UniProtKB/Swiss-Prot annotation:
The chain crosses the membrane at residues 241-261. SUPFAM superfamilies: Immunoglobulin. Belongs to the immunoglobulin superfamily. ICAM family. GO terms for biological process: cell adhesion; cell-cell adhesion. GO terms for cellular component: extracellular region; membrane; plasma membrane. It is a single-pass type I membrane protein. InterPro entries: ICAM_N, ICAM_VCAM, ICAM_VCAM_N, Ig-like_dom_sf, Ig-like_fold. This is Intercellular adhesion molecule 4. It comes from Homo sapiens (Human). ICAM proteins are ligands for the leukocyte adhesion protein LFA-1 (integrin alpha-L/beta-2). ICAM4 is also a ligand for alpha-4/beta-1 and alpha-V integrins. It holds the Pfam family ICAM_N. Glycans are attached at residues 68, 78, 190, 223. One of its GO terms (molecular function) is integrin binding.
Amino acid sequence: MGSLFPLSLLFFLAAAYPGVGSALGRRTKRAQSPKGSPLAPSGTSVPFWVRMSPEFVAVQPGKSVQLNCSNSCPQPQNSSLRTPLRQGKTLRGPGWVSYQLLDVRAWSSLAHCLVTCAGKTRWATSRITAYKPPHSVILEPPVLKGRKYTLRCHVTQVFPVGYLVVTLRHGSRVIYSESLERFTGLDLANVTLTYEFAAGPRDFWQPVICHARLNLDGLVVRNSSAPITLMLAWSPAPTALASGSIAALVGILLTVGAAYLCKCLAMKSQA
């Protein structure tokens, strides 16, 4: 009879205060959890990171690339690579996957590594650029027309042309520079740049050099021509002009000399 009173009191409290009964139920369930810790909800995500290495890589057309995707997920559910490039061998290890990309020819492509952990998906990205440095940079001998020199520079077998910058340098200063970003072709190309340069007296005997530069999102590839010195002797016009001036000067001197000689002879004959 003594134990019946507390039991009746418990039922009375549960009926009067429903929260007490639910709290007791939750306390009982927690006590039944393993190791005495509350059970994690099924929708809880595990914090983790995903990284790609290298994040940027540049190769010559037709070469292969190796990309490494690492993550901090203790038990990844899935790991995959999304890219328009053709994939080769795939190697896997604890916390990493290595992907091989074959025959890279597109000038710029993206590769996304996706990792799913506890129902949540994260990703990282690498950019792959294909390029071909200029095979040669050739500066033709300047041609003088009137008072201007025509400079012509040839850049051969370069890709992608849209990222090429051609610069003409005379001595220590840049006399012309052009970016070819308007060209969007996907093949190797030859580029010719023509520029007219009005040279003054101080510009002679100084070298002219043609520089070609590819700017590939962090990678810079350069090539240059052999220097060529501006000289008056390259143009027949200045030579002819100089010869005519010398001949005229000689003629004047001969005339003056002959007149002076005749005057001297006349003075002697009078004496």
